[in-house]
A protein has these predicted regions:
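Structural motif
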Residues: 173, 263, 313-315
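Short, flexible loop segments at the rims of nucleotide/cofactor-binding pockets, characterized by
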Residues: 12-13, 39-40, 84-90, 150-157, ...
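N-terminal alpha/beta PP-like core and its mobile active-site loop of ThDP/TPP-dependent enzymes
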Residues: 1-227, 257, 340-342
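Short glycine/proline- and acidic residue-enriched helix-loop micro-motifs
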Residues: 30-33, 81, 230-243, 368
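Active-site diphosphate/adenylate-binding microenvironment
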Residues: 231-311
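Thiamine diphosphate
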Residues: 11-19, 274-422
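Active-site flanking residues adjacent to catalytic metal/cofactor-binding acidic residues
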Residues: 6, 177, 266, 319-320, ...
Length: 422
């Protein structure tokens, strides 16, 4: 990603005008590369350098003083074209050490992140699992996962600390691929920060920035697993659910409605807690998740996904509290005619904050605490909100209606919003 940030003209900065700020100081914690362009003449070259620096997974910030918009560029100086260096493979010693662990017969889990959760990497991992009996999983939050029928299934380490500890308690070895060892998202009284057992060893195999496809192929070769047949997810064609809306019926309806090659943006938090397991056998799709713990990630990411892949339908699952942060994304979707189905789970509360309140041992929140996390005074009219931004919308109160409306949303191009009343 390249961020281009405008600044006052250089000569104007000395007057401490409004909007003057330490842009570099603000950008530094969030950028891998920062440059301030001095003249219009150097702008083209600096922009090219920013693009080069902003390879996948990295952020470049280019600061442009006002005079770069009106100055004479002349013959712009461009840097020579250079191809990006190939990702390095992990060391042979690391691969051989991990191979010994997998051949030891002790319970082992491989945890994947980064670019290792889609493309060819999971296929190599599936062969390794078929050969050795190890299990494959992702962190609870993973940027992108290829899921669905015909793909190598990856388990998901639970979010809640007690469930995560239980999930990991049987393993004596954890192998990491483009991620670190599992840790709790927050610290809670009386609960551990490290989720693995004390006698469980962690073995880094592939670091972030290294080539997971090559590294896992090397490991498969070291295990003589290239010919092994990975277990692939079977298609689960359950009938569409009927009756009341709850996390289970919502997940079943979604699994039945997802078209092939869809993109599922998941910021459903509490209501979507059953989605991961119950959509595993849906049609092949990609899941995009929030990596930073922010609120309001869903609708902008769905907008970007639809712009990047206009031939694929995007489903965005988002809570009503989260959606209020970035609901203006609907206007962009309408303006650009983007193929996004936004699903608003309307429980009229920041339910995730109530859960975290309870996790701290505070019990039930009182009136003052509830006043900060309930959003029902006034209650948000999501249909009117969507209509005001040019997006058609419906409200559903049963599982069968929810399923039918998701199917209908795919039949016509452009954005659509479904309010799920809870």
């Amino acid at each position: 990603m390249v961020n281009i940030v405008g600044e006052h003209a250089t000569a104007h900065l000395r007057y401490d005008a409004p909007l003057k700020s330490d842009i570099e100081g603000l950008a530094r914690p969030l950028s891998h590369w920062i440059r301030r362009t001095d003249t219009a003449h150097s702008l083209a070259g600096d922009a090219a350098m920013a693009v080069r620096a902003a390879r996948p997974g990295r952020i470049a910030t280019l600061i442009l003083p006002g005079e770069t918009s009106w100055g004479e560029a002349g013959n712009a100086e461009l840097p020579p074209l250079l191809s990006l260096p190939a990702k390095p493979a992990p060391s042979t010693a690391r691969v051989e050490q991990v191979a010994k662990v997998l051949l030891s017969g002790e319970p082992t889990l491989i945890v994947f992140g980064g670019t290792a959760t889609f493309g060819a990497a999971p296929e190599h991992a599936g062969r390794i699992a078929a050969k050795t009996g190890c299990r494959l999983a992702t962190q609870f939050f993973t940027a992108r996962i290829a899921r669905g029928a015909g793909r190598v299934p990856l388990e998901r380490i639970p979010y809640a600390v007690p469930q995560a500890v239980k999930f990991l308690q049987a393993f004596r070895h954890i192998i990491t691929v483009e991620t670190g060892e599992p840790v709790a998202f927050f610290s809670y009284p009386g609960m551990p920060s490290l989720l693995k057992p004390e006698d469980c060893q962690v073995h880094p195999l592939i670091d972030a920035g290294e080539d997971s496809v090559t590294g896992l192929a090397m490991l498969a070769d070291a295990l003589d697993a290239r010919a092994a047949q990975p277990r692939l997810q079977e298609r689960n064609r359950q009938p569409a659910p009927q009756g009341a809306l709850n996390p289970t019926s919502i997940a079943h309806a979604l699994a039945a409605a997802l078209p092939e090659n869809a993109i599922l943006v998941d910021e459903s938090l509490t209501t979507g807690r059953e989605t991961s397991g119950l959509t595993a056998g849906a049609a092949p799709h990609d899941v995009l998740q929030n990596m930073g713990g922010s609120i309001g990630f869903g609708t902008p990411v769905a907008t970007g996904a639809a712009l990047a892949a206009p031939d694929r339908r995007v489903f965005c699952m988002v809570g009503d509290g989260s959606a209020m942060y970035t609901i203006q994304s609907l206007w962009t979707q309408a303006r650009e005619g983007l193929n996004v189905t936004t699903i608003i789970f309307a429980n009229n509360s920041y339910q995730i904050l109530k859960t975290e309140f309870a996790n701290m041992g505070f019990g039930e929140p009182g009136p003052q605490a509830l006043a900060m996390i309930d959003i029902d005074r006034p209650r948000i009219d999501w249909l009117a909100m969507a209509k005001s931004m040019g997006v058609p919308a419906v409200s559903v109160a049963t599982a069968e209606d929810f399923h039918r409306r998701m199917i209908d949303s795919v039949k016509e191009p452009g954005p659509f919003l479904i309010e799920v009343k809870l």
